[in-house]
Each structure stands twice: as C-alpha cells, then as structure tokens.
C-alpha cells in the first residue's frame, strides 16, 4: 500500500462495494484506518464495514460505506484478550469472532490458541462472550456466513500442539541453552504436514442454537491463512495458504456447500511466476471477485521452501528469508494468469469485492509494519491498475 499523506480518492463513480450485499455508495475520499492493522479480522453488515483486532489489540472500528467521509469510527473494544488470526464472519446482523491466538493474560509467559467465541451486536455496540467452546483451534481459519444463517469455518491450527510448542519454547533461554533451543525448534518445524493435525473438517456454527456441527472432511491437506473468495451462494474458492509452518501450497480448491455437506473440487494451481521461479504458494493473500474473475494479490512465502520439501527437508523454511509478495493473479474459473503487481509486497490484511476490482485494506509490509492505507486494484479482465 502507498504511504500517502494526501487523502485518496477511488474514482469509481456510483457503485456497489459487495462483501455479502450490494450496497450503493458514491465516489468519496476514502479515509485511512486509524491505526495500521495486520493479522486482524473483518466483517460487513449492510453498509457497515468492521475491522480490528490483530495488531490493533482490542480496538474495533467501523466505516459507513455509504458515507465514508465520516471516517472510521471507534466501536466498543473487544472484551477478550488481544487476539491475532481470529476467524470472523457476520450472520443474522451480528459479528462472530472465533479462536485466534495471543496471551490469555498480560503476564502469561507464552501465547496460546484460544477456544473461545464472541459476538458483537452493532445495535447495542457491545460484545458478549458466547457460552461455547470451539471444537478445535481455529487460529488461521477462514469463516464465512451461509444463506441459512450458519457460519462455515475452514482450517485452523491444532491447539494442543501449538500451545505445547510455544510453552516449551518460552521455557528455554535460547542464549544460555542454544543447543536445546535449536533441537526443540528443529523437532517441531521438521514434521511433515500431516503431523501438525490442523483442522480437516468444515465446521459449522449455528448462532440460533449455539451449537456446532460438521459439513464433512476436507479431502486435501488442511491449510491456514488461505485467500478466500465467495463465488456465489454457497460456493467458495480457497486459494493457497500454509500446509505447515513455513510451507505454502500453490493449490486452489472450489468448495460447494449443498444439502448439508461440503463438496470439494480442485481447480488450477497458482501459476509459476517464470520459468526460473516456481510457484511457492502464499499465505495471507488478498482475494475477491472482480467482475467475472477472481483476483488474488500479495501474501507471504519463503522462496525455496517448495524445493526443500520436495527433497525431504521438512523444516522447509530453515535459513530462508520471508518474502512479502507483490504479485497479482486473475482466475477466470478455469485458468490463472499473472495480472500485474501491487504497489508493494503486502500480506495479512483485509480485502473486499469492489466495483471493477478488489479493495485492499491494511496488512503487513516487508518491514513487518502494519499498514493503514486503502486502495483499489482495478481489473477490466485485461489490465490491472491501482486507484488510490
């Protein structure tokens, strides 16, 4: 995202910014987020966009998409511990936040994956803790509202393994015990993807009954922090994401939810960037519909991790530098193509369908900085441009 001091104008005329509905709004100056937000969560109800958590701590903000000149308005703080990577979705006029990771108390020695769930009511501007526990860890998962009022959730880290690993790491002084520290990290990071036991069920939460169910198993390796786009009612495209810490997949899958079950179909992989640079896959990318196509932009990976994994080196990102990607891809329902570039490498922000393109909000840059800026990736099916 551009670091701009001047106000930014998205010259898109009168159009609809569609996350889940098609609200109409006029072209306006779009305000920056009040603070940079990465690893946060976002949802929309009607014309109101909600973004927060992650690097914003317990802060939660709303923007009226029909009147963006009012700017982002501070809403009630999240009442749980500061949370990264929560799964968030809207249903029945409320916003639900599941799991995530962080310290249970400020003085806790290590983070954990939360098994809690919270609901935000815009009418009362208040949060409540739900009387339920997530069946598994859902940090890094994707949540989406369904037409029947339930919420489907894909992926998520294993709470037991994650909590134990971070507790063990936190108990070792790596300066005084470098060998023990290295052995612990090597042991955890060197496991094959299946050993991490990430959530391989399509879970479903029913707010009306406050209960959980399953739409069936994921026939592929479960992944975390994929990009996700809504293709139609009950149809979702899951793109790339991690299959274990440090290793992404270039795979994309179409999920159709019909008759109480999730039906999976593999579609084309993200394409290689060049003959000399294979596709590593990305985590934390931005995605959404742009006309008839899906755009996937940015994300982060480790160049060389795929080759290491193919050679049986399962600590695949050991010694590799993390890369924040600026690549943008377009998918026409059959094939991918490289559409262009972001202004900078970005990952772990929010993205929303917008008229003619993809609205990119917040995220993390190559310096690890949480960004505040918003811009539109405009796509006409042939050429990509940036409006800011």
UniProtKB/Swiss-Prot annotation:
Its EC number is 5.1.3.24. Kelch repeats lie at residues 48-92, 94-147, 149-186, 187-232, 236-285, 307-356, 358-387. Gene3D superfamilies: Kelch-type beta propeller. SUPFAM superfamilies: Kelch motif. GO terms for molecular function: racemase and epimerase activity, acting on carbohydrates and derivatives. Its main location: periplasm. Residues 1-26 form the signal peptide. It catalyses: N-acetyl-alpha-neuraminate = N-acetyl-beta-neuraminate. One of its GO terms (cellular component) is periplasmic space. Keywords: Carbohydrate metabolism, Isomerase, Kelch repeat, Periplasm, Repeat, Signal. InterPro entries: Kelch-typ_b-propeller, NANM, NanM_proteobact. It is found in: Periplasm. Pfam families: NANM (PF24996). The active site is at residue 242. Converts alpha-N-acetylneuranimic acid (Neu5Ac) to the beta-anomer, accelerating the equilibrium between the alpha- and beta-anomers. Probably facilitates sialidase-negative bacteria to compete successfully for limited amounts of extracellular Neu5Ac, which is likely taken up in the beta-anomer. In addition, the rapid removal of sialic acid from solution might be advantageous to the bacterium to damp down host responses. Homodimer. Belongs to the NanM family. This is N-acetylneuraminate epimerase. The gene is nanM.
